[in-house]
Amino acid sequence: MHHVAYTVPDLDQAVDFFVDVLGAELAYRIGPVEFPDSDWMERYLGVHPKATMDLAMLRLGPVSNCELFQYSAPEQRREMPRNSDWGGHHLAFHVADMEEAVAYLRAQPGVRILGEPQPLDPGSTRGDSWVYFLSPWGMQMELIRMPPGMAYESRTTTRLYQPEDH
């Protein structure tokens, strides 16, 4: 995987949050990009031909990149999808210390923790703990702690990537 990409309502706010709160590094920004006299935006990006776009590419940890877009377009939907909606999504961050990470996020302006960290005991994910949180603009994210030796490992040779692998 090279990168994941998300459309955000305010690119400056999102870049600041990813850099200042989540520890990302800004690689570059481009924009505004627009092609008012052609159908380029629709043909290549699947958006309204009159859309304008700004983007930022971020390095997020040792092996991940994250591209953030801000579009302005006619007929643009302006609500974040829920996880249960088609196209719903969330971005998960591995943490070594769940309590410390939750306390850190609780101290960040505009961040909303959804409930409390949930330990998982049954089945393949025994040993995992997780909690969802919302960014200041409502994007769903997750903190996850998956220690080595998870229950699923006894049934397959496939191993999920862990930060310790890098």
Predicted features along the sequence, with ranges:
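Short, structured motif recognition centered on aromatic/hydrophobic residues
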Residues: 1, 8, 55-58, 63-69, ...
